[in-house]
């Protein structure tokens, strides 16, 4: 049996999330670190069906009063930031929104690497590059 090469953990953001992150002054490095922590098992809230909620610490600030993110997540494979909000504006997402995120997770987390590359090429997703040395 041939050994299987380890899969690379990839991090993406949707175009709407990219707009939110820009307005909230959340850097790609902040997003990468948030996804890295989730991949290390430090998940703030597992909402089921491949959907997690993570607090985002902006450079130099803590997590408690800051932004929240909804991430489509598969351990050691992929994290896709799809929705962001400020804690002061929204405590939690509604159950119908959660169901829609779970359905989206079913689709996106099922994509092959080549399908993900197509989504990046057509501009639907933006791949976040790991920091140098990761």
Q: Where does each model-flagged region fall?
A:
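Arg/Lys-rich, positively charged N-terminal/basic patches that mediate binding to nucleic acids
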Residues: 1-26, 118-134
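Polybasic/polar functional segments that serve as interface/processing modules
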Residues: 1-6, 30-35, 58-60, 102
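Preference for short coil/turn "hinge" residues that link or interrupt alpha-helices
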Residues: 4-5, 19, 36-40, 78, ...
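N-terminal first-folded block
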Residues: 10-57
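Amphipathic alpha-helical interface surfaces
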Residues: 13, 27-31, 63-66, 78-81, ...
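A broad, structure-centric signal for solvent-exposed, well-ordered loop/edge residues
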Residues: 18-19, 33, 61, 89-92, ...
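Basic/aromatic recognition patch in beta-strand/loop cores that engages polyanionic ligands
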Residues: 44-85, 89
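Enriched for short, Lys/Arg-rich terminal
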Residues: 72-126, 130
